[in-house]
């Protein structure tokens, strides 16, 4: 049986589901950029890419060298093809306008170029997260300047989302709104090959991921829920749970898509003005789209994440996503 490459899969989607050719091209360009990022990550100290830049991004986070390198790879790969009207990145203060010398396209690309970059120096998994939106008609004119408002669309408006994870293998996990597929990079071929055809999250689980060092800062509903998880079979949930934490959302979510589980990053009391740590546009929305398409659920503790109307490019949210049964339980505790 012949292997199905990402290119073949996307062409077949164009034939069977009328996936637009420009969207197909965009996904292929993002995938090529992810291969380049994977190559840079794999070089590590040999490529002189470890360590920090000595600068901070708009979030106030210290930028690693690979954060900046990955951001530039994605910008340069996508700016010239004529399929995008603009881009936005966790590493940039403002939206990126496609240079005037290139044609503008119908889509917007939003990305976290290197999620989990604190793992780089310890050789643990990192990844790239991306989301594709349609550009509002009023910004499609070649002469119309793009601004932040064009990107402020709820997650339900995403036409595609995915991530690449750079671990023992490099994988690209993708949804076009019709289920979730996983592609593994065959380095000899230089192509992503379909290896996970129908990724589905079990409804129930006995595994959760949360940073327990923040426990003292959590709100009461989170304290209650996590204490019940830790109580195991002697507690109200009547079963034992294992805890996992990789400190990279892309790695924790990949595990959940592979075998089920619950990922939590609750809001806490340290910065009451901020509703969470993770970014809605770059992290929560694309991951929520993937998780829902795989049969899971995703909320901020009160409402479905994909229904949130963004108010800013770098807006933060609390996140509970994964196996539906546990997401619904955690959300119910917030509403009690």
Swiss-Prot record:
EC number per UniProt: 3.1.3.11
The keyword Phosphoprotein is assigned to this record: no
CDD domains: FBPase (cd00354)
Sample GO molecular function, one term: fructose 1,6-bisphosphate 1-phosphatase activity
Primary residence: cytoplasm
Keywords: Carbohydrate metabolism, Cytoplasm, Hydrolase, Magnesium, Metal-binding
Catalyses which reaction(s): beta-D-fructose 1,6-bisphosphate + H2O = beta-D-fructose 6-phosphate + phosphate
The organism of origin for this protein: Pseudomonas syringae pv. syringae (strain B728a)
Pathway in which this enzyme or protein is active: Carbohydrate biosynthesis; gluconeogenesis
Compartment(s) where it occurs, according to its Swiss-Prot or TrEMBL record: Cytoplasm
Binding site for Mg(2+) 1: 90, 112, 114
Name of the molecule in the record: Fructose-1,6-bisphosphatase class 1
Cofactor names: Mg(2+)
Gene Ontology CC entries for this record: cytosol
HAMAP family the UniProt entry points to: FBPase_class1 (MF_01855)
